[in-house]
Amino acid sequence: MLLLADKTVDIKRITAAVIGEMNVIDLNNIEKYRENNRIEAKKATGGLPKSLWETYSSFANTLGGIILLGVEEYRDKSLHPVNLPDPDELIEEFWEIANDIQKVSTNILSYDDVYVQKIEEKHIIVITVPKAKRFDRPVYLDGSIHNSYRRNGEGDYRCTLDQINAMVRDSEIKTQDMNIIESMTASVFNTDSLHSYRIKMSNVKPNNRLQNLSDKDFLQAIGAIGVGEDLLFHPTAAGLLMFGRSEFIKKEYPYYCLEYKDTTQDDKHTIISSDLNSDCENLYDFFIKVFEKISYDIKLTANIKSDITPITTALQEALANCLINADYYGSNGVVVMKDDESITISNPGGFRVELDAARAGGISDPRNTAIMRMFNLIGIGSNDGFGISNIFSVWKSHKLVLPVIEESFNPESITLKLSFVPESKSTKTQILQNRPDIETDRQDAVISYITDNITVTSKEISELLGISHKKSKQILHKLMAKDFVIIKNGKYTLKA
C-alpha cells in the first residue's frame, strides 16, 4: 500500500483494471470514464452491433479490455447507461455467436466474463475480454484470418499481413526455428563460427559424446541441419541463424539485424553489427562478442576480478533470452544499448507467456527452442523458465534499481532495461523498491488513474506514486510514445 496524505492507494487494485481484471472499474460512476484502448461502449438498443465482434477480436489480440453494451457516448465523450429492453436475450444471442466458429475463430470467454449490471435503474451488459493465449491468436471473424483486429488509441483496426503472420508463427506448437530451409545447403554455414562453438562446448563439457562427431553429424545432432522432402540435408532455421553467413540469413529473414551500441562517455560509440562486422554475422558470434564487451566493461568499472559473478551470469542469461525469444521475421532487429548507467536489450516479437508468470518463473515457452538448446549445450541459459526471475533476484540482492520490462506493439517488441544505479541513489520510495518491474506497474497505475479521472497533470501523478516531478513526466512521455496517452492543454488523457 502506498500512503498519501489523506488517502491510501492500493497499487494492485489500480493496476488490476489494465492487466486483466477490467471489472474493477466503478460502473456506478460510469460517466467518469471515456472510451480508450481498454474500454468500448456500444448503445446496442437495436440488438447486438456488428462492430462488437471487431472489438472482441481486437481486445483478444492486443491487451484485453471491457465492452459495455447499453452504454451511450455523449458528444462530450462521457458515457451514460441506456436501458436495454431484454439483456438476457442479448446475452443468449451473444453466446450463440461467440460459440459459432463460422463467425468467431475461438471463444476465449468464460460465463463469468459476461453479465448484466444494474446502473441508475437501467440494465447494461458487461463483457470482459482477456488477452488471448498465444495458441488462440489471432482471434478472427467470419472464417477469414484476414479479419483479425487489434486495438490502439484510435480504436479497432484490421491487422496487417505481417501482424497476422507473427501471431500465426507464435501459435504453432513446433517453434519456427525447427523448420528446414530446403532452398539452402550446408554451404550457408560460417565454419569459423561452428568450430568456435565446438571448442567452447568442449571446454564446458569436455566429455560430451558430440565432440567426436564430424561437422555434418554434429550439425545434425544439435538440430542445425535436417533431412528435407528431397531426402537431402538442409539447414534448419536455428542452424542458419546460429552459424550462418549474413547474406544467406537475410535471404530467409529480410529484416535480420543484430546491433550493439556503447554510448558511454569513455567509449566513442562502439558499434558491433551484423551488417558492419564480417566476424559478427550470426547469433553465436554476436552473443560472444557482445557478452565479452559487456562483461569486461562491468568488471573494469566495478573492479571485479572473477570472470563469473552473479551479475555477469544474469547478463549472459538476459542476452541469450533476447536472442532465443526474438521473432526474426519481425520488421525490427535485435538492439543492445549500453550507457553509463544501464544496458537495454530489445528484441522483435511479443510475450508468449504473461509477464507476471515470467517474473514468477517456472513456465518455459521460448519462441525458438532449437536455438535455446544450442545455447544450453555451451552452458548458457536454462530451460526451466526461471531466467527472468533469476535476473530480478540478482538485481535485488545487489540492491540495484530493479529491471524494467516493456512490451510494445506495431511493431511488436520486448525491451529489458538493466540499471546499474544503486537503490540508494534512486528516487523510489522503499515500499516501491521492493516491487518487481515497478516501471511497468507505474505505467499501469497511471493508465488506470487517468481512466478514473479523465485528465491528470504530471504533478498529480508525482503525488499519486510518490515520485519526483521529473520521473512522473518520464512515465507519461513513455505512455505517449506507446500511443496510449496524449496531452491537451497541459493535461494528460487517454487517447480516444
Predicted regions, residues:
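Conserved N-terminal catalytic/coupling substructures associated with nucleotide/phosphate chemistry
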Residues: 1-312, 317-424, 428-430, 456-458, ...
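Short basic coil micro-motifs at the edges of alpha-helical modules that engage polyanionic partners
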Residues: 307, 435-436
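Minor-groove-contacting beta-hairpin "wing" of winged helix-turn-helix DNA-binding domains
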Residues: 415, 490-496
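Acidic, carboxylate-rich catalytic segments that either coordinate divalent cations
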Residues: 462, 471
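A short, conserved structural fragment
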Residues: 480-490
